[in-house]
A protein has these predicted regions:
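Interfacial/capping segments of alpha-helical transmembrane domains
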Residues: 58-115, 241-251
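Transmembrane alpha-helical segments in multi-pass inner-membrane proteins
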Residues: 324-404
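Helix-loop-helix "hairpin" substructures at the membrane interface of multi-pass membrane proteins
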Residues: 268-344, 368-369
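Short, non-helical or kinked segments that cap or interrupt transmembrane helices
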Residues: 68-73, 154-170, 213-222, 342-355, ...
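Short loop segments and helix-boundary regions at transmembrane helix junctions
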Residues: 38-46, 154-162, 183-250, 287-293, ...
Length: 438
């Protein structure tokens, strides 16, 4: 074979060996990458779901031990095991059935109310039948606002544990504008009261934000201290300058009707426009964090502050902005309560929404839509708890225990991964591959 023929054959051989852009290796790699991403997303969703399920399993065990009848049956377990198991199972079913009925309403009652409404046009029984669902949405609304606030902080690398205090000062500002200013028309007065609450909460979040950015003071300590200041400020104002009437009770005067967040349905249903405002804010937060340059900078700082600094992000400014946004969203929960539900402010108007928001953000993976879903769960639990206690005799504190167990399992996901063997196969394959390489 001549040299010229060897040279002419060489390019052809090289051309045959080069994989095409759509060759099986690149396609296979792309497919594997997509499968890996989807598997990671699936696990991200699966772990919170299993955390909730496991918390309810723990709750079921506590239900068994919270009834004297079941305890007596278990005392005779070795004599009559089937009775103990049957009574325990029935107590669990009764408790969770009452919980669901209290959260969504009685299906039979709803069906009869709809039938009556169709035949006679009478709406009272229909409204009564759907009242449990309405109450669940009333509880859900402040959860969404406060959960979004904590989630924004998490995305920016900040632990805003001061949502409860921010909620209180927002309620104070909104209720003051709501009752002190008179003569304004409805939309303007309502918006002014809502903005006053947001501004007060933003100011409350600015303080720990600037301390973190300028002095490096940890936001957890600062926000806890700001909580105490907010609580004591509320106590002072409710027993002094803002007290209503004769001063017999520590409450503010009722706000003007022009400052109300309007109800969606007639009484006794209390769900109001704030619920749809909360859903709109969730969509807005998603758009801001994932579709805008400023939102990307917040997520960059939260993911890797050093890399964000090298990329030219102003860390101090983003830190302050994140805390202000987080506090503003939490403050909307307080404004929502006084403008849409209570129409005045009392000492215990919050009932811990700001503290529960930490669990909501963790359960929702700090994603706005995840926060909405977890808020619905907590709202339904809180609404159904009273009926569970009155009908099934299960203590209402069980709901708090279930919520606490959800937090434990979310904060320590390895418990769930180990319990349900999530990711074990992948780890075993990696170990086997490393052993084979050695």
């Amino acid at each position: 074979m001549s040299k010229t023929s060897q040279k002419s054959d060489k390019p052809e051989m090289e051309k045959k060996e080069q994989p095409s852009l759509l060759g099986p290796s690149l396609l296979g790699r792309s497919l594997l990458d997509r499968i890996a991403v989807r598997k990671g997303t699936f696990e991200t969703i699966l772990v919170p779901l299993l955390s909730v399920f496991t918390a309810f399993v723990v709750g079921s065990i506590l239900i068994i031990f919270s009834h004297a009848e079941t305890l007596a049956a278990w005392g005779n377990f070795f004599h009559d095991p089937w009775t103990a198991i049957t009574i325990s199972w029935q107590s669990i079913i009764d408790a969770y059935r009452a919980l669901l009925t209290g959260a969504f309403g009685d299906p039979k009652q709803i069906g009869e109310a709809i039938k009556t409404w169709r035949t006679t046009g009478e709406t009272k029984t229909l409204l009564d039948a759907f009242r449990p669902l309405s109450e669940s949405l009333v509880f859900t609304t402040p959860y969404i606002f406060a959960g979004l606030g904590v989630a924004v902080g998490f995305r920016g690398g900040l632990f805003n544990i001061g949502a409860e205090g921010q909620l209180f000062v927002a309620g104070l500002a909104s209720v003051f504008v709501g009752y002190a200013i008179k003569g304004l028309p409805w939309p303007l007065h309502m918006l002014l009261a809502l903005l006053a609450g947001i501004a007060a909460a933003a100011l409350w979040g600015f303080v720990p934000g600037i301390l973190k950015a300028r002095l490096g003071a940890h936001e957890v300590i600062n926000t806890i201290m700001m909580n105490y200041i907010a609580f004591r400020l509320t106590d002072y104002l409710l027993t002094g300058p803002m007290i209503a009437g004769s001063g017999a009770l520590p409450i503010t005067p009722d706000i003007q009707r022009s400052a109300y967040l309007p109800a969606l349905f007639p009484a006794p249903m209390r769900v109001h426009w704030g619920f749809f405002l909360a859903l709109a804010m969730a969509a807005l937060v998603y758009w801001f964090l994932w579709k805008t340059p400023l939102g990307m900078e917040i997520r960059m700082v939260g993911a890797n502050p050093r890399a964000a600094r090298y990329a030219g992000v102003r860390i101090a400014a983003i830190t302050v902005l994140t805390m202000v946004l987080s506090a503003s969203l939490a403050g909307m929960a307080g404004a929502n309560q006084v403008l849409g539900v209570e129409h005045r402010l009392v000492r215990a108007f919050s009932s811990g929404y700001g503290f529960d928001a930490i669990a909501l953000a963790l359960l929702g993976n700090s994603h706005p839509f995840g926060v909405v879903i977890s808020s619905l769960l907590f709202g339904f639990l809180r609404s159904g708890a009273a009926r569970m206690q009155s009908v099934a005799g299960t203590p209402v504190e069980l709901i708090r225990i279930i919520q606490g167990m959800v937090i434990v399992f979310i904060a320590a996901p390895e418990i769930i991964r180990s319990l349900y063997r999530i990711g074990r196969t992948k780890k075993k394959k990696a170990v086997a591959k490393a052993a084979a390489a050695d």
